[in-house]
Amino acid sequence: MKKITAAITGVQGYVPNYILTNKELETMVETNDEWIRSRTGIKERRILKGEGKGTSVLGIEAVRGLLKKINIDAQEVDLIICATATPDMIFPSTACIIADKVGATNAFAYDLMAACSGFLYAISTASKFIETGTYKKVIVVGADKMSSIVDYQDR
């Protein structure tokens, strides 16, 4: 029996257009650019704006870009795992929303919620599905819309 080995065959990212700068944060909370940079190294953050736009929007854009980049039809995808701490809603899962919007009609899809380690768990889980022969083409999405849970007034 031939051993199946999982491999990462493509990587794609997506960030929203809106940029929240440290200068803007100065108007929301008692802080300044130098204080933030010296303690965190953060200069700016990308924020997904718009009514009803959730984490799935980030995943949809990234998956569309990935499918185009590696030249795979969405219907060839067997499984989508979305690692997120900020799902759009309890159900349907963010992964199911992504699968639907990108046209991955043959894919199983589920969310894996394990905070910061979620993406690592999702990669590990995906590799096991591939190596056991359960699925061939698996997409792992790591996405969070932290702006939906961050209190910008809390220093």
How would you name each of these model-derived features?
Residues 78-85:
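Short glycine-rich or small-residue beta-strand-to-loop segments that form or flank ligand, phosphate
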Residues 1-78, 102:
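Conserved "HGTGT" condensation-loop signature of ketosynthase/thiolase-family condensing enzymes
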Residues 2-3, 27, 68-74, 87-155:
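Acyl-thioester C-C bond-transforming condensing/cleaving domain
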